[in-house]
Amino acid sequence: MKSYAIIQTGSKQYQVSEGDVIDVELLDGISEGQEIVFDQVLFTFDGSKVSLGTPIVKDAVVKGQLLSQVRGEKVTAYKYKRRKNYHRKTGHRQNYLRVKISNLVI
C-alpha cells in the first residue's frame, strides 16, 4: 500500500503522498521553484506502520516544491432586500500556492 501523511498548514489539513499536487494557503517569503518544508505532520502511514501524533509526529517532515501561485474559484455574495430596490453583489477570489509533494520523511 502507498505511504501517505496528513499535514497541517494554514489551519487546514491535507492528506498527501509523493507526487501529489495540492493548493495551500499563501506562505510568506516563498518564491517559485523554492522548496517548502511542512513540519506539522499529524499522521503518517508507510505501508505497514501507522504513526499518530499527539498532536505532531516527531521527526516527520514533508517536503514539497513550489510550482506557482494560483487563484481559486470566485465566490459570490449577494445581498437583497425586497421592495426597497436594494441589492449588492460582491465577489472574492482566494490566492493559493500550488505545491508538488516531493518527499515524505517518516
UniProtKB/Swiss-Prot annotation:
UniProt GO cellular component terms:
cytoplasm; ribonucleoprotein complex; ribosome
Q: Which GO terms describe its molecular function?
A: rRNA binding; structural constituent of ribosome
Domain of life (superkingdom): Bacteria
Q: Which UniProt keywords apply?
A: Ribonucleoprotein, Ribosomal protein, RNA-binding, rRNA-binding
Q: Alphabetically, which GO biological process terms does the record hold?
A: translation
> Which InterPro entries would you find in this protein's record?
bL21-like, bL21-like_sf, Ribosomal_bL21, Ribosomal_bL21_CS
* HAMAP family per record: Ribosomal_bL21
> Under what name is this protein listed?
Large ribosomal subunit protein bL21
- Its source organism is Chlamydia caviae (strain ATCC VR-813 / DSM 19441 / 03DC25 / GPIC)
